[in-house]
């Protein structure tokens, strides 16, 4: 399947070259692509309209990164491989996943995102997290946590806002009980006990190199 992603003497095709650069430039892109790929892999009840929306989301995500889905499909050689049968959304997503693995993506981040995506699908939660305003809110939170190293108390307030809108990710844990295990100590945002999975997610997905978050059992 991947014979087409290298052209002329092992030089990456335009889609592969663009994707490689975009992944290096932005950690967000891997997270966004992982959500799409894992939604496809775990979406047992996906309908035709769902596949259409996944493909459109993939196109928009790549466009924001400056890449064209058509170029990546061409690099993968899917059209030559499938010919008159036609290239489905599933073919594209499976091909993209194999390409990402060839590009040596961070498997730890990818698997963490997959676990969360599956949980969201199981709880009918995924469509909510893809809402435009919530995506922006999450990106703003990433900036505050990872780049600015913002006020931990304000970050806790932001987390509450997100989780109030996404109770489906809590796995039955009450919001009040969860936040009893999230606190600030010596300027460090700490996650303990039942809040540990949330802290792990923030570190693995939002900012793996962050220094102002502490997670313990």
Curated annotation (Swiss-Prot):
Stable between 25 and 95 degrees Celsius. It is found in: Secreted. One of its GO terms (cellular component) is extracellular region. Exclusively expressed in females in the early oviduct, the glandular part of the oviduct (pars convoluta dilata) and in the cloaca. Keywords: Disulfide bond, Secreted. Disulfide bonds join 18-67, 38-114, 125-168, 146-207. It comes from the Eukaryota. The keyword RNA-binding does not apply. Mass spectrometry data suggest sequence microheterogeneity hinting at the existence of several isoforms. Monomer. Acts as a surfactant. Is the major protein constituent (45%) of foam nests. Has no antimicrobial activity, no larvicidal activity, and is not toxic to mice. This is Ranaspumin.
